[in-house]
Regions:
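Short, hinge-like loop/turn segments at secondary-structure boundaries
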Residues: 55-60, 234-238
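Flavin (primarily FAD) cofactor-binding/catalytic cores of flavoenzymes
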Residues: 1-45, 49, 93-196, 200-350
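N-terminal/domain-start segments enriched in small and hydrophobic, helix-friendly residues
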Residues: 34-35, 41-42, 60-77, 86, ...
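Short alpha-helical interface elements
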Residues: 55, 63-66, 109, 242
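FAD-binding beta-loop-beta segment adjacent to the flavin cofactor pocket
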Residues: 54-56, 67-71, 344-350
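A conserved beta-strand/loop capping segment in the N-terminal third of enzymes
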Residues: 70-104, 272
Length: 350
C-alpha cells in the first residue's frame, strides 16, 4: 500500500528494506503475528516486478505452489489460491487448464498481496541503517528503530562495462524491452544471452506479424546450446528446506561449486518456449522460407559493441572453441545478460 497505518509507530520487531518477492513473502508469513510487529519499506511508488518484460505469452517457470506462502503455510491469506478466490476467478482458472501460469497473472498476484498487506509501505525509501543496541533506520520521511532487519532490495540489470556507455533507444537491457521494441520493422536485431529472457525476446520477434517483423534476428549465447531449465523431480529436492539447511553449512568453495554445477535449475529455458521457437523456425525455414534472416550462434563471447556506419552497431565476439573473432552489424542490440546484486549504500552506517 502507498500509505501507512503505522505512521505513529516508531519501533518494530522486524523492519524489511525492500518489498520485492523475497521480502513480500516474509511480510506475508509474519502478517497478523502479534509478537512480531513489522513494517516493510520500499522506495518505489508502487509494486513492480519485471513490468517491461511482460511479453505476451510469457509464463512462470515454477509451480503455482511456489508462491509467497503456500509451501510454508498453506492456510496463509496471501497464497496464490487465496488471490484467485478473492478475485472471483478460481473456477475459471482451474477450467482454463494452464500448463504454466501466465507471468502477468503472477505479477498481478504479487501486487495484490502487497496492496492487501498494510505492513507493506511504498514511497518510503531507506536512506541509512545504523546500529546502537537496536537498528536505527532513517528514511526519506522519518526515523525508526527495529530489533531485526531483513534486506530484500533485489537485483539490478547487468551489462558488460564496455556496453554501459552505449545504452539507449537502440541498445538496451532486456528489462526495458517492452518500452523500446516498437520500431523493429525492417531492422537487424541482435540478442545477446542464452537464457529464458533472451529466448522470450527471440520468440517474440519471430512471432511479429508480417510488415512489422525485423529483416534479421541474430541470437548469441556463450553456452554450447540453448539449454532447457532443469525442473526435474530430484533436482527440485535442492529447493527443499532440509537441503537448504545442509547447503548453508557447507564451506564457501563447495557452495559456489554447487551453484555453478546446478545453474540450469534456475537459469535455463522453459521446454515450452524452446518447443515454440523450434516450431516457429521450422515454419520460417521450410514452409514460408525467405521471409527473414535468422542466425543462432552458441559458444560465442561478445567482447565489444562499437558504433558502426549509418547509426548501426558492430557486435564483436569470439568463438570459444576456435578463438576466431567474428562480428555482425545490428540496428538494435538487446542485452539479455541477467542481473546483479543491487548496491546497498544505505548500509554505510554499519
Amino acid at each position: 500500500m502507498t500509505g501507512s497505518r503505522k505512521d505513529v509507530q516508531s519501533h518494530f520487531k522486524l523492519l524489511g528494506v525492500g518489498a520485492g518477492p523475497a521480502n513480500l513473502s516474509l511480510a506475508s508469513l509474519v502478517y497478523g503475528k502479534q509478537e512480531m510487529s513489522n513494517i516493510f519499506l520500499d522506495g518505489k511508488s508502487s509494486f513492480s516486478w519485471h513490468d517491461d518484460q511482460m511479453i505476451d505469452g510469457a509464463t512462470l517457470q515454477v509451480s503455482l505452489f511456489k508462491d509467497l506462502s503456500t509451501l510454508t503455510d498453506p492456510t496463509n491469506k496471501f497464497t496464490f489460491l487465496a488471490y484467485l478466490h478473492d478475485k472471483g476467478r478460481i473456477y475459471h482458472f482451474i477450467n482454463a487448464q494452464f500448463d504454466e501460469i501466465p507471468r502477468r497473472e503472477f505479477r498481478n498476484y504479487l501486487a495484490w498481496a502487497a496492496e492487501k498487506n498494510e505492513n507493506v509501505v511504498f514511497g518510503e525509501k531507506v536512506l541509512n541503517v545504523d546500529f546502537d543496541n537496536v537498528f536505527k533506520i532513517v528514511t526519506n520521511k522519518r526515523e525508526l528503530t527495529a530489533d531485526n532487519i531483513a534486506i530484500g532490495v533485489g537485483t539490478q540489470p547487468w551489462v558488460p562495462e564496455f556496453a554501459s556507455a552505449h545504452l539507449g533507444q537502440t541498445q538496451f537491457h532486456v528489462s526495458k524491452y517492452m518500452q523500446r521494441n516498437s520500431s523493429v520493422a525492417g531492422k537487424q536485431v541482435t540478442i545477446i544471452g542464452g537464457g529464458q529472457s533472451g529466448a522470450e525476446v527471440f520468440l517474440d520477434l519471430l512471432s511479429t506479424p508480417d510488415g512489422e517483423r525485423p529483416v534479421g534476428i541474430h541470437w548469441i549465447s556463450r553456452r554450447r546450446n540453448f539449454f532447457p531449465i532443469d525442473d526435474s523431480t530430484f533436482t527440485n529436492d535442492f529447493y527443499m528446506p532440509c537441503y537448504s539447511d545442509y547447503f548453508n553449512k557447507l564451506p564457501l568453495h563447495l557452495r559456489q561449486q554447487t551453484n555453478r554445477e546446478n545453474i540450469l535449475t534456475s537459469d535455463g529455458i522453459s521446454e515450452s518456449t524452446l518447443r515454440q521457437i523450434y516450431q516457429k523456425l521450422y515454419s520460417l525455414n521450410f514452409i514460408t522460407p525467405g521471409q527473414i534472416d535468422i542466425a543462432l550462434q552458441t559458444s560465442r563471447s561478445v567482447s565489444n559493441v562499437k558504433l558502426g556506419g549509418n547509426n548501426t552497431w558492430r557486435v564483436e565476439y569470439c568463438h570459444l572453441d576456435s578463438a576466431d573473432m567474428e562480428s555482425k552489424e545490428a540496428d538494435i542490440v538487446v542485452w539479455a545478460t541477467g542481473y546483479t546484486a543491487t548496491e546497498k549504500h544505505f548500509l554505510g552506517g554499519l
